[in-house]
Design a protein with these regions (language model features):
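Ribonuclease/tRNase effector modules and their secretory precursors
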Residues: 1-102
Length: 102
């Protein structure tokens, strides 16, 4: 843990997500869902520190849009997994930062 955040380098490459039963209500865009979280993960994402309850903002460009997935630690305590707590299009400032960092 760096700065109290979970270590993204320990996440399982194939199955890193612990999806809560009520995750659907966390999506701010009606056309984004769990499949998009998988797309962000498989698109060589960048990670930015987040405000609680998330530890990280996982960002990647998917189909021309920068998507952001806030990640919280696994409820089970498994360091190989984390909980995505949303999925939405990045705000212009974060999208710009992501594109500069790429």
């Amino acid at each position: 843990m760096a700065d109290g955040r979970f270590d993204v380098d320990l996440l399982d490459e194939q199955d890193p997500f612990e999806i809560d039963a009520q995750a659907a209500h966390l999506f701010k865009h009606p056309h984004l869902g769990i499949e998009d979280i998988d797309d962000v993960w498989s698109s060589d994402p960048l990670f930015y520190p987040a405000k609680p309850p998330a530890h990280w903002l996982m960002c990647a460009e998917v189909s021309g849009r920068v998507l952001v997935v806030p990640l919280a630690p696994s409820r089970s305590g498994d360091p190989r997994r984390c909980r995505p707590i949303g999925c939405y299009e990045a705000a212009p400032a974060l999208a710009g930062q992501y594109r500069r960092d790429r």
